[in-house]
UniProtKB/Swiss-Prot annotation:
Underlying gene: pilD
Organism field: Myxococcus xanthus (strain DK1622)
A GO molecular function held by the record: metal ion binding
Name the record gives this protein: Prepilin leader peptidase/N-methyltransferase
Main function: Plays an essential role in type IV pili and type II pseudopili formation by proteolytically removing the leader sequence from substrate proteins and subsequently monomethylating the alpha-amino group of the newly exposed N-terminal phenylalanine.
Enzyme Commission designation: 3.4.23.43, 2.1.1.-
InterPro entries registered for this protein in UniProt: Peptidase_A24A_bac, Prepilin_IV_endopep_pep, Prepilin_pept_A24_N, Prepilin_peptidase/N-MTase
Family from the record: Belongs to the peptidase A24 family.
Catalytic activity of the protein: Typically cleaves a -Gly-|-Phe- bond to release an N-terminal, basic peptide of 5-8 residues from type IV prepilin, and then N-methylates the new N-terminal amino group, the methyl donor being S-adenosyl-L-methionine
């Protein structure tokens, strides 16, 4: 049953309710975006102005309306309030409404809303801090698996496979990046985000997620280079003093032991790929990781993964119709 099939005026009424709920969730997601990267509580203290410390009253926290009523300025000190706060609220409300249009009043709406509530803050956190907090991606992955259980064992199995395939494929790319190029090929948190997407969208959608994210990220990256030129790193040029080499990835010392049975060597491969730590940056001469500074033209991959996940979640049936059948099949039939 979709919202349009509800009796009388209840269909539009519930649609408006879900949109307003999305606005309120978006207001909370602004708190998540601001506090989670700093390891601060998202419950206490109450929201306040970061400049003057003015604690916001309840009527200053009404999504969209408070920002407009305050004319985008703090009531305590008059400092401008970023337009991103109402934009996140509006974006979340619109995505909630889009999920309703896509799934109707069915159980599938529940995991869709949960996924939206995870992807929005993760995208903005990665834009701001270049991190994807494990405190969000790992519980999100588990939530995707758990929410698939009421849909039946096939859906539950697909969610498990999606999480496993997403994590292991990106873990392998991460390993190959260090083994072959001696540098980081992917962000450390990307594999957990892809595992979360696999749990919600199933493993069949992962190729589409990777393809859409890579293409859109590449287009924007090229446009940024054309607009700004090839900017160097934000720090001084250090080509004359190259960073220390990354440690050789020999997995574990057991591989070098003579007489080790072949079956043990094969068994150690997946185990070591899963548990061996891979540094996030090259090591200096003392063996400590150097501080990594993104170039001015660099953009994180997390937002593009989140965007691709939302596109497949909301536009899957439409993409299946407009794309050639062989491409749609290659992308797992799309969700």
């Amino acid at each position: 049953m979709t919202h349009s099939s509800l009796p009388g005026y209840f269909g539009p009424l519930f649609a408006v309710f879900l949109f307003v709920l999305g606005l309120c969730v978006g207001s909370f997601l602004n708190v998540v975006i601001a506090r989670v990267p700093l390891d601060q509580s998202i419950v206490r203290p109450r929201s306040r102005c970061p400049r003057c410390g003015h604690v916001l009253a309840w009527y200053e926290n009404i999504p969209l309306l408070s920002w407009l009523a305050l004319r985008a300025r703090c009531r305590g000190c008059g400092v401008p309030i970023s337009v991103r706060y109402p934009l996140v609220e509006l974006l979340t409300g619109l995505l909630f409404f889009a999920c309703l249009r896509r799934f109707g009043w069915t159980y599938e709406l529940v995991p869709a809303l949960v996924l939206v509530s995870l992807l929005v803050p993760l995208a903005f956190i990665d834009l701001d801090h270049w991190i994807l907090p494990l405190s969000m991606t790992v519980p999100g992955m588990l939530a995707g698996i758990a929410l698939a259980f009421p849909l039946g064992m096939d859906a539950f199995r697909d969610a498990l496979m999606g999480a496993a395939v997403g994590f292991l494929s990106f873990r392998m790319m991460e390993y190959v990046g260090w083994k072959v190029f001696q540098r980081e090929a992917l962000g450390a948190g990307d594999k957990y985000l892809v595992a979360m997407l696999g749990a919600f969208l199933t493993w069949r959608a992962l190729l589409g997620v990777l393809l859409f994210a890579s293409m859109q990220g590449a287009v924007v990256g090229i446009l940024m280079l054309l607009a700004t030129g090839r900017a160097g790193p934000r720090t001084e040029n250090t080509q004359d003093e190259p960073a220390g080499d990354a440690p050789p990835l020999t997995m574990t010392w057991e591989f070098t032991q003579p007489g080790l049975p072949l079956w043990k060597r094969l068994l150690l491969v997946p185990v070591c790929l899963l548990v061996q730590p891979i540094p996030d940056a090259p090591l200096d001469e003392e063996g400590e990781e150097e501080e990594w500074v993104p170039e001015r033209t660099s953009i994180p991959f997390g937002p593009w993964l989140a965007l691709a996940g939302l596109e497949l979640l909301l536009l899957g049936p439409w993409l299946s119709r407009v794309l050639p059948a062989d491409i749609a099949m290659m992308l797992g039939g799309l969700p």
